[in-house]
């Protein structure tokens, strides 16, 4: 665009040419995510997607929106922007997956005060990587440059996912029964929740970004910025051969707030603490914050990022399949009859 046509807007703080430069940088990234349903290119007013409804008697669209939260503050602090895009995708696609939906497409929203093309391109590269992992298309997005709205060098992200499921195969927890087995799938790290506390504890620790995280051989930066695991391929594999009765994406509120969201009112979940491997980062956070394990399980995933609930007769086979898929997983609990005297539905045995 000729400079004189955008001069006044640039002087006001919005650089249209920078926005165009970003679009040029990310075109190939976006194209790398396209699936056969995409029938439009980047730059249109809306993204076009033609879903394949073959084999679905009663298709239902499933949608979700989410952000990355204050994990972004660490991205700014560490000047590391290439993984938060994966987090952004994971937070939405894992949510639609809980209902048994296959993610179809994703859209992102990037808002900042002054557009840093390099940082934004790194973010979008992560979004594209997340979409490839989730086997969904990055169909479009919005970049908003809003002077005076954000501190220099900072931005915010939001993501939107649409998936599809056959109505008869929607997973809603209604088939969960007493005796079913609760299987926890390992997390990659802290994922994207609890980072307001994580940041405070990191500052308290006195460690630098390049220092080694206690109990690991990785830097504090790499451990804290490890992206949220995307479970789409693994769960889609399980759903082909097993009856998955309920699923949980373990996000804000941990076990106590998320597992009850899929349980019928007639049952409780009993969790055996110690049945799974707790990652070193959670021991580090607990020690720094002088937190109890019940507090930790209310705030963080503590090493379990996703839960599936299956019948007892299928539990061993499901665990075997997960091992074959290189997905760490453990039988972490069972479904029991509801305790009528209590409002709680999750009980953790700390032994």
Swiss-Prot record:
Its main location: cytoplasm. It catalyses: 2-formamido-N(1)-(5-O-phospho-beta-D-ribosyl)acetamidine + ATP = 5-amino-1-(5-phospho-beta-D-ribosyl)imidazole + ADP + phosphate + H(+). Keywords: ATP-binding, Cytoplasm, Ligase, Nucleotide-binding, Purine biosynthesis. InterPro entries: PurM-like_C_dom, PurM-like_C_sf, PurM-like_N, PurM-like_N_sf, PurM_cligase. GO terms for biological process: 'de novo' IMP biosynthetic process; adenine biosynthetic process. One of its GO terms (cellular component) is cytosol. Pathway: Purine metabolism; IMP biosynthesis via de novo pathway; 5-amino-1-(5-phospho-D-ribosyl)imidazole from N(2)-formyl-N(1)-(5-phospho-D-ribosyl)glycinamide: step 2/2. It comes from the Bacteria. It is found in: Cytoplasm. CDD domains: PurM (cd02196). Its EC number is 6.3.3.1. One of its GO terms (molecular function) is ATP binding. Belongs to the AIR synthase family. This is Phosphoribosylformylglycinamidine cyclo-ligase.
């Amino acid at each position: 665009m000729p400079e004189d046509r955008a001069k006044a807007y640039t002087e006001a703080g919005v650089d249209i040419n920078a926005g165009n430069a970003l679009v040029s940088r990310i075109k190939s990234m976006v194209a790398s995510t396209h699936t056969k349903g995409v029938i439009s290119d980047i730059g249109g007013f809306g993204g076009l997607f033609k879903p394949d409804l073959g084999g679905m008697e009663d298709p239902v669209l499933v949608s979700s929106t989410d952000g990355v939260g204050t994990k972004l503050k660490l991205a700014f602090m560490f000047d590391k922007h290439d993984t938060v895009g994966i987090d952004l995708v994971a937070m939405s696609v894992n949510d639609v997956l809980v209902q048994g939906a296959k993610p179809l497409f994703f859209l992102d929203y990037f808002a900042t005060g002054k557009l840093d093309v390099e940082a934004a391109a790194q973010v979008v590269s992560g979004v594209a990587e997340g979409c490839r992992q989730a086997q969904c298309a990055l169909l479009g997005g919005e970049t908003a440059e809003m002077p005076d709205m954000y501190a220099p060098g900072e931005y915010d992200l939001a993501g939107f996912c649409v998936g599809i499921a056959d109505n008869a195969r929607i997973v809603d927890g209604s088939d969960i029964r007493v005796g079913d087995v609760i299987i926890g799938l390992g997390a990659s790290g802290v994922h994207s929740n609890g980072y307001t506390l994580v940041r405070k504890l990191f500052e308290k620790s006195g460690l630098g970004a390049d220092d080694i995280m206690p109990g690991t051989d990785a830097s504090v930066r790499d451990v804290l910025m490890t992206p949220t695991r995307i479970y789409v391929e693994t769960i889609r594999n399980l759903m082909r051969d097993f009856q998955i009765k309920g699923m949980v994406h373990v996000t804000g509120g941990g076990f106590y707030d998320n597992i009850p969201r899929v349980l019928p009112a007639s049952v409780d979940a009993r969790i055996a603490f110690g049945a799974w491997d707790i990652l070193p980062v959670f021991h580090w956070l607990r020690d720094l914050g002088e937190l109890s394990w019940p507090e930790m399980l209310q705030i963080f995933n503590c090493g379990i990022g996703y839960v599936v609930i299956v019948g007892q007769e299928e539990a061993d086979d499901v665990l075997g399949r997960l091992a074959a898929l290189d997905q760490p997983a453990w039988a972490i609990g069972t479904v029991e009859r509801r305790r009528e005297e209590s409002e709680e539905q999750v009980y953790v045995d700390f032994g």
